[in-house]
Amino acid sequence: MRCISPTALVTFCAGFCISNPVLAQGLEAGVGPRADCEVCKEFLDRFYNSLLSRGIDFSADTIEKELLNFCSDAKGKENRLCYYLGATTDAATKILGEVTRPMSVHIPAVKICEKLKKMDSQICELKYGKKLDLASVDLWKMRVAELKQILQRWGEECRACAEKSDYVNLIRELAPKYVEIYPQTEL
């Protein structure tokens, strides 16, 4: 058997990684941790951290009850994730066990989401909308539908708004209340 020098081994491995397009693909700048299963990872991480901070018992049944409660407050893309998991009242399928069992033994959210992706690819297709910085955006240049979306995400509604100026004034009035809670609003 031949002995290989460490530099020859490193050179061989580096050449192999660069020549293999599948391995080199992960080295691209565009591939980031948020690129895949973004909603699933962030939602389950937040859920797991809330369980830890409240000192909840990590049994599958307890986690399932807490997940149902957590999903009852979810809105937007996170509500859609809860629907796919079966944690909403109108859900067609129920795969909560695929979340609660692994989480009861402290498996990271990334691994849980990868497993869920194999079961239902729609779960990882959910993406958060682009972020909107209310301090830098000109509300007058936005469409009324976009202004309504901002209010909807905040859980507010303007029944008396007839013109664009009414929506803009209401958003500016409510912004201090919600900018502290939601530093950047999704559009």
From Swiss-Prot:
Superkingdom, natural source: Eukaryota
Subcellular location as annotated: Secreted
InterPro entries to which the protein is assigned, alphabetical: ARMET-like, ARMET_C, ARMET_N, SAP_dom_sf
Cellular component annotations (GO), alphabetically ordered: extracellular region
Expression sites by tissue: Expressed at high levels in the heart, skeletal muscle, testis and brain (at protein level). In the brain, detected in the cerebral cortex neurons through layers II to VI. In the hippocampus, detected in the CA1 to CA3 pyramidal regions and in the granule and polymorph layers of dentate gyrus. Weak expression in the striatum. In substantia nigra, detected in solitary cells that did not express tyrosine hydroxylase, a marker for dopaminergic neurons. Relatively high expression in the Purkinje cells of the cerebellum and in regions of the brain stem, including the locus coeruleus.
One MF term in the entry's GO annotations: growth factor activity
Swiss-Prot/TrEMBL keywords: Disulfide bond, Growth factor, Secreted, Signal
Main localization (coarse): secreted
Signal peptide: 1-24
Disulfide bonds: C37-C124, C40-C113, C71-C82
Family assignment from sequence similarity: Belongs to the ARMET family.
UniProt function note: Trophic factor for dopamine neurons. Prevents the 6-hydroxydopamine (6-OHDA)-induced degeneration of dopaminergic neurons. When administered after 6-OHDA-lesioning, restores the dopaminergic function and prevents the degeneration of dopaminergic neurons in substantia nigra.
Full protein name: Cerebral dopamine neurotrophic factor
Organism this protein belongs to: Mus musculus (Mouse)
